[in-house]
């Protein structure tokens, strides 16, 4: 058959997309395709796109146009492929194939068909696939860290979100399958496992008839991985049983990523999250009572249609009162296929940006205070990078998740991919600074 073409992957978007990219890389490598990180040397470039909000789509389009101008043969995968399949094929003649979010497992066959002269459109109308531990995977994270997808898709219908349209309804993996993959990752030397799905606290509902996150955490407690971190924990799913499992399972970090989106019941109702307005405060207090050292991250949307000054003031007061460790704020992005796109009283972009900036300014001294409280402490740090010019190491403590939170800059001797004790000497709004304890 001759030499197989060389493939590169350009990964855009979230951790779910990253796992899809890693499975495609694993499948291609297993099938004998050379994989190169350098897009210039590749015969084909797979662009795994994001379509969550307008800015993500713009980044995806820029990447596609740059590759097209470089005369690269492009395979478009991911959420934008699922979202705009026909438009992309008509607008981008360099696209030799387009692959949906539920079809990335067919990437080898897609390339074979392209090599035979076809222009391929491989997109399921409703994604139903989820990869398990038997599907090859080539990790692209630092050596000590891995994401582990426990479920795919979402059964909620938040009025601003197109994810169910792009990723399908929730389908969970079995506890046994997840534990087997966790064990594989432990055998590879992974020190930190990050559990992800669209709504991690709903894990198992479709498969077992009730959420099973507590049981999953207890099972993962038997796996030899020092840190297990939970992302995308919805507040209503943080039952006493789940909170107890977090508290009692030694390798589960007391770190919770809570995408609250807003605090005011009126806005939450318009977001089609009416249940949340009644429980935000009580659940946050319950977490802090049960796990006093819990680290809480959250995200908010400002400028949702109909958000008045009163609604916004409620959110500002909420942020001040709860003193979250980490806060992300996004301006509302109107998505055409969602109910929120057609809602009255859309907020001007300038006002949305002012509201976002104000909350971030309010959060900065809170974050600084939280970080300064670590000065003098000896904390475990997972070492991920080394600065070859200074010899300084860079890592994260348990209170920092990858990419979204801060870093720890470390003086002293260390090895990449290991967790070591570090004495914190200084802090700023985002990061910590310390030295290795021998």
Curated annotation (Swiss-Prot):
Residues 5-116 form the MTTase N-terminal domain. One of its GO terms (biological process) is tRNA modification. It holds the Pfam family TRAM_2. It comes from the Bacteria. [4Fe-4S] cluster 2 binds at residues 154, 158, 161. Residues 372-438 form the TRAM domain. One of its GO terms (cellular component) is cytosol. Its cofactor is [4Fe-4S] cluster. HAMAP family: MTTase_RimO. This is Ribosomal protein uS12 methylthiotransferase RimO. It comes from Gloeothece citriformis (strain PCC 7424) (Cyanothece sp. (strain PCC 7424)). The lineage of its organism: Bacteria, Bacillati, Cyanobacteriota, Cyanophyceae, Oscillatoriophycideae.
């Amino acid at each position: 058959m001759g030499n197989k073409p060389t493939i590169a992957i350009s990964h855009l978007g979230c951790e779910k997309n990253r796992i899809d990219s890693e499975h495609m890389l694993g499948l291609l490598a297993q099938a004998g395709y050379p994989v190169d990180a350098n897009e210039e040397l590749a015969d084909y470039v797979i662009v795994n796109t994001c379509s969550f909000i307008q800015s993500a789509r713009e980044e995806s389009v820029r990447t596609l146009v740059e590759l097209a101008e470089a005369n690269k043969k492009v395979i478009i995968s991911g959420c934008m492929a699922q979202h705009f399949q026909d438009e992309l094929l008509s607008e981008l003649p360099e696209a030799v194939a387009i692959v949906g979010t539920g079809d990335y497992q067919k990437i080898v066959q897609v390339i074979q068909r392209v090599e035979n002269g076809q222009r391929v459109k491989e997109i399921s109308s409703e994604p139903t696939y989820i990869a398990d531990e038997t599907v090859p995977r080539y990790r692209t994270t630092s050596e000590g860290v891995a994401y582990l997808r426990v479920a795919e898709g979402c059964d909620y219908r938040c009025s601003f979100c197109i994810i169910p349209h792009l990723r399908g309804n929730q389908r969970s993996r079995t506890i046994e399958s997840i534990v087997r993959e966790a064990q594989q990752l432990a055998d590879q030397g992974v020190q930190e496992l990050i559990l992800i799905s669209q709504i991690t606290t709903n894990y198992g509902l479709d498969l077992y008839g009730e959420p099973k996150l507590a049981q999953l955490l207890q099972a993962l407690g038997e796996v030899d991985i020092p840190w297990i971190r939970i992302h995308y924990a919805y507040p209503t799913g943080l039952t006493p049983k789940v909170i107890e499992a977090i508290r009692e399972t030694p390798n589960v970090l007391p770190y919770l990523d809570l995408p609250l989106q807003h605090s005011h019941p009126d806005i939450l109702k318009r977001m089609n999250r009416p249940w949340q307005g009644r429980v935000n405060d009580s659940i946050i207090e319950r977490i802090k009572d049960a796990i006093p050292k819990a680290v809480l991250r959250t995200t908010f949307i400002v400028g949702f249609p109909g958000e008045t000054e009163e609604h916004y003031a409620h959110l500002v007061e909420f942020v001040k009162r709860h003193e979250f460790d980490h806060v992300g704020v996004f301006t509302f992005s109107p998505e055409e296929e969602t109910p929120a796109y057609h809602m009255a009283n859309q907020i001007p972009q300038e006002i949305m940006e002012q509201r976002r900036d104000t909350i971030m300014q309010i959060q900065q001294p809170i974050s600084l205070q939280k970080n300064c409280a670590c000065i003098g402490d000896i904390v475990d740090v997972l070492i991920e990078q080394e600065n070859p010019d200074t010899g300084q190491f860079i890592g994260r403590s348990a209170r920092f998740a990858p990419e979204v939170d801060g870093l720890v800059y470390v003086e002293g001797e260390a090895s990449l991919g290991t967790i070591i004790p570090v004495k914190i000497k200084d802090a700023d709004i985002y990061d910590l600074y310390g030295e290795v304890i021998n």
